[in-house]
Amino acid sequence: MPVVKGGVWTNIEDEILKASVSKYGLNQWARVSSLLARKTPKQCKARWNEWLDPSIKKIEWSKEEDEKLLHLAKLMPTQWRTIAPIVGRTANQCLERYQRLLDEAEQREASALGLTGPDGGEAHAPSADDVRKLRPGEVDPDPETKPARPDTIDLDEDEKEMLSEARARLANTQGKKAKRKARERQQEESRRLAALQKRRELKTAGINIKVTTKKQGQMDYNADIPFEKKPVPGFYDTTEEMSRNEYQRAHFDPKKQQVGNKRKGEEDERDGKRRKGDKDPSVQAALKAGQLQKMREAEQSSKRRALVLPAPQVGEGELEEIVKMGMIGERANMLARESDNDATRGLINNYSTLNTNAPIRTPMAPAQEDHIANEIRNIRALTETQSSLLGGENTPLHQGVGSTGFESVAPRKQVMSTPNPLATPLRAAGAGPGATPLRVGQTPLRTPRDTFALNDAGDEMSMVGGTPRDVKMREMSIRHQLKQGLASLPKPKETEWELELPDDQQEPKTAEQLEEDAAERDRREREIREARELLERKRRTQVMQRDLPRPVQVDYQSLLKEASQAEDPVKVLIAREAALLVAHDATKYPLPGAQPTGRALEIQKIDDAALQEAKLQVLMEIKDKPKPEEVQAVWEKSNSSSLLLGLGCYEDDEEEEQISTMQIALEEVIDQIVASAEKGNKLEKKLNLHLGGYKNRAEMLRKKISEAHEALEKANNALGAFKVLQSSEQAAIRNRLAALREEVGFVSTREREAQELYRRTREELDALTLNGPKANGFR
């Protein structure tokens, strides 16, 4: 019984087709179809070109692709094989998307007109998807463009035979062709090694030859780097990378790494044993999905870059200088306003407040038209209109800006470039729409605090984009106007003036008291404070000056009692003074973390001169330093014994006692570590409980700020594009109006001439009719 080839593709057939294409290529479809008992070569080729080809895009259609599809469908109707490579989809995908767009547009219009019918799903009219669905008994005409049918649990005998034959043929590596390929690979490897050996010998002999074994369109993996992306030439700051590397190197612990690798190996071994025990296909699918999710997360984390913020434009020093300049200017204004000279007061005005009468507002981006809907209306209007042979008006179509934006195969794109000052409307003194406003309004282009009207509208503002020649010509014209104005002044009257100089009066001299600069005052006060601190530090004890350790708790009474037991009265005084100093330092200057009890004892303040005299007397009473030979002899004597100091008392201890002591110490350390870990966990939970909401709020605000910034950038780009488009459209409108006026004038002239010709011809005809001969009583 012959087998009817065709029908729905199965998953097994798809896998066999992909494996056979990888072996036989894209030209031997007869050999590929020999592995599939139910498919023809034409069906195999169609299946590969319409579904299995990795270059086929199966993602959602973008707006640009829809616009390009509709425009090309208008230019080349029903030529889907030609449209498909331009759009980047298959012909069947283009046709289905085109029909779906038309159906969606028709459905929107029907819903807008209220053509929904009565309520209830059974009473509604069938949709486009319902109409295209296959009815029971119908055969899909294009099964190559549909997803594969899942494999059944129990395969047919024909499918099992086909699968086994395909496995055997695709796994054949001992045939003539496989042996020839292996032999060719071996010969290629031997040639490569021979060339390498020859090149090495020539290099040792001082001869360098260039390797030219690279083929066109291929890569030499021995010389080139796969997927290499060379950085842009230039200088880069690697300080952050070096600091990050040093930080990682300092915090790297090889022991932790070894323990982590060991634990990871143990966990992988346990997971492998557990996977072997799980035979459920759903469990296997879940594990595979989890692995894919981990891979995607790893890719996302590797793609994520560190946040690089720009350096501040103004530093702290510059801010301080700006503040000082403002204070100096304000002080000068105050002095000028307090002066008795009217001329000085007239030249000073208030420049401290801003003109906030015209606040700057963020412009709203204009609403955009639905280009896809307009193009669909054009297509429907062209398909549903009657023939042009019947006459009537043409169907109105959306063209120009309201269409898809395609003038050819590629869309229109406004290229943002630096404006040319000779071509932009900046030099036209604000003429024309889209020009930069040259007067003070919503966008102030001059100083908002111009009290003396120094910046006139149309003065320098109109020369923003002017060339140096234009600026020079304008200066010359202003100078000429000034000369003309001075020349037009009336001549002064001839009057004799007598000036009497007032008597010189000696003004009382007042001592000018200049206010000291804040920085100089701060520096002087800081030096005085540092000198006082240094002097106070020198008055302290040597223990405090050298920052030596001090006792946490001091029993002053016990120290006094011990000092009183000495026989020498001088030593008693010295011991009492030492006890007083120790107690004073421990109480007044405690160690960090210590909590002294009681109040610091008062010590007698000694004059600096008396203190220096006492130090001098002490130095005179101190014995001379020992000679280096004596110190060396004592050192050799103390280090001649190999026994460490303090270990003599441990010679008789038993080994078991030492082990027990060390075990007790180890247990105490472990208990302390566990207690510290528990305390840290509690603190971490407490902080997460108190600060979790703030962290989430900060993350949400950060995302909103980034989204708002992106939206603002897009709106600014759109605004600039539409401004450029508006200026170009205004220029084109004038040209088109002039051309239309010329055409209308030409048509009017021709019509007038034709009317004149018709009038003369009519008059001649009437004259001939009146003056002509009569025949049978009729003219």
UniProtKB/Swiss-Prot annotation:
Gene Ontology molecular function: any one: DNA binding
DNA-binding region range list: 29-52, 80-102
An example Gene Ontology biological process: mRNA splicing, via spliceosome
UniProt-listed CDD domains: SANT, SANT_CDC5_II
Keyword terms, alphabetized: Coiled coil, Cytoplasm, DNA-binding, mRNA processing, mRNA splicing, Nucleus, Repeat, Spliceosome
Origin: domain of life: Eukaryota
Region annotated Disordered, chain positions: 113-192, 246-284, 424-448, 497-525
Listed Basic and acidic residues bias regions: 127-152, 246-256, 263-281
Main subcellular location: cytoplasm
SMART domains, alphabetized: SANT
GO cellular component, one term: cytosol
Protein localization: Cytoplasm; Nucleus
Xref: SUPFAM superfamilies: Homeodomain-like
Residue ranges the record marks as coiled coil: 157-204, 653-772
Quaternary structure annotation from Swiss-Prot or TrEMBL: Associated with the spliceosome.
Similarity field: Belongs to the CEF1 family.
Record function comment: Involved in pre-mRNA splicing and cell cycle control.
Matching PANTHER family: CELL DIVISION CYCLE 5-LIKE PROTEIN (PTHR45885:SF1)
UniProt name for this protein: Pre-mRNA-splicing factor cef-1
Species for this entry: Neurospora crassa (strain ATCC 24698 / 74-OR23-1A / CBS 708.71 / DSM 1257 / FGSC 987)
